[in-house]
Amino acid sequence: MRVYVVGGAVRDRLLGLPVQDHDWVVVGATPDEMLARGFRAVGKDFPVFLHPRTGEEYALARTERKSGRGYTGFTVHASPDVTLEEDLRRRDLTINAMAQDEDGTLIDPYGGRRDLENRVFRHVSEAFAEDPVRVLRVARFAARFEGFSVAGETLALMRTMVDDGEVDHLVAERVWQELARGLMETRPSRMFAVLRECCALARILPEVDRLFGVPQPPQHHPEVDTGIHVMAVVDHAAATAQPLAVRWACLLHDLGKADTPVHVLPHHYGHEAKSADRARAVSERLKAPLECRDLAVLLAREHGILHQARALRPVTIVKLLERTDALRRPERFGLLLEAAACDFHGRPGMAERPYVQAAIWQAALAAVRSVDAGAIARSCTDKASIPQRVHEARVAAVKARHAEEKD
């Protein structure tokens, strides 16, 4: 029985990155031997055990053979005669197909260290094509590891997988899981660039893919291309350490621009409502968490008016605060403003400029929240008029705040 640490832990150690988790492979052992040593069996599809002291996962060396479409169609073979090299061969990329023994000796049968030094993502074998999730994983790694590129032969294989319809068999939950993880990396735009390169973005997120090449008014968007703008917005959200809901909202906020008639371009009148509808549809199709869906819909619908804060009448400001439920959910409204700021900053030359609109909206919200709706309700004899009376008091409070600021 021989034990090796494999995969990401070895890769990250060679890159000088912190190692968060260890994955272990056990060669030459049976399930009964693992149980006899105090390990606890947890694997359903293949033999995986938890260490009795550390709780880390130890998997018996195994091979996998494709037996159906999608990422679940595999036949697994795990036995004491499976070698370490055979186990490593089933892995996706050479940089993830390295191992270290208990003495720290590197086992690298597929050139992973060389590819790390050259900053290349390269598939280990043609078995890469058997699991369509790997297309998303490679794209996600591109968002994490700065300066890496996809080997030409690997990109060609990914395109073939897309053409063969393998990506179409991915379930929504798995697509969301990989997209969400990629959005939380340091440069999410690289994930979408790789997905575009292999033509997978058009299958997974066609609504985003359609944004590339759609022009915007250059006086407001020097980058012109809507797709480029959206990528800059998402990257700014990552650079400012925004949570997933904000990053997802940033990705979807301009989807309606792809529907603008050609004769209207580069203007996009009323694109916010279309964007909101598409943001909801995409979020529901991929089964995104409700907080991600709802913030995406809000940003898509409201980002245009949020940017106009300095020119709005108090009544317009109050209406937005009411329809976004900002009074009951101020934390979510704060996230909405963070996302709007990312949209503002996602243009050339704007990254360092302050988004003053956020302070205007927060001040207005504070003024509206100072209104005692309960007192108004108690003093009102006509109960049907209570909502209107409260609304009018809120507008008056915002007017008063504006007057104070001018003074």
UniProtKB/Swiss-Prot annotation:
Mg(2+) binds at residues 21, 23. CDD domains: HDc, NT_ClassII-CCAase. Its cofactor is Mg(2+); Ni(2+). Keywords: ATP-binding, Hydrolase, Magnesium, Metal-binding, Multifunctional enzyme, Nickel, Nucleotide-binding, Nucleotidyltransferase, RNA repair, RNA-binding, Transferase, tRNA processing. Disulfide bonds: none annotated. Residues 226-327 form the HD domain. It catalyses: a tRNA precursor + 2 CTP + ATP = a tRNA with a 3' CCA end + 3 diphosphate; a tRNA with a 3' CCA end + 2 CTP + ATP = a tRNA with a 3' CCACCA end + 3 diphosphate. Pfam families: HD, PolyA_pol, PolyA_pol_RNAbd. ATP binds at residues 8, 11, 91, 137, 140. Its EC number is 2.7.7.72, 3.1.3.-, 3.1.4.-. Transmembrane segments: none annotated. PROSITE patterns: HD. HAMAP family: CCA_bact_type1 (MF_01261), CCA_bact_type2 (MF_01262). Comprises two domains: an N-terminal domain containing the nucleotidyltransferase activity and a C-terminal HD domain associated with both phosphodiesterase and phosphatase activities. Catalyzes the addition and repair of the essential 3'-terminal CCA sequence in tRNAs without using a nucleic acid template. Adds these three nucleotides in the order of C, C, and A to the tRNA nucleotide-73, using CTP and ATP as substrates and producing inorganic pyrophosphate. tRNA 3'-terminal CCA addition is required both for tRNA processing and repair. Also involved in tRNA surveillance by mediating tandem CCA addition to generate a CCACCA at the 3' terminus of unstable tRNAs. While stable tRNAs receive only 3'-terminal CCA, unstable tRNAs are marked with CCACCA and rapidly degraded. Belongs to the tRNA nucleotidyltransferase/poly(A) polymerase family. Bacterial CCA-adding enzyme type 1 subfamily. Monomer. Can also form homodimers and oligomers. This is Multifunctional CCA protein. It comes from Aromatoleum aromaticum (strain DSM 19018 / LMG 30748 / EbN1). The gene is cca.
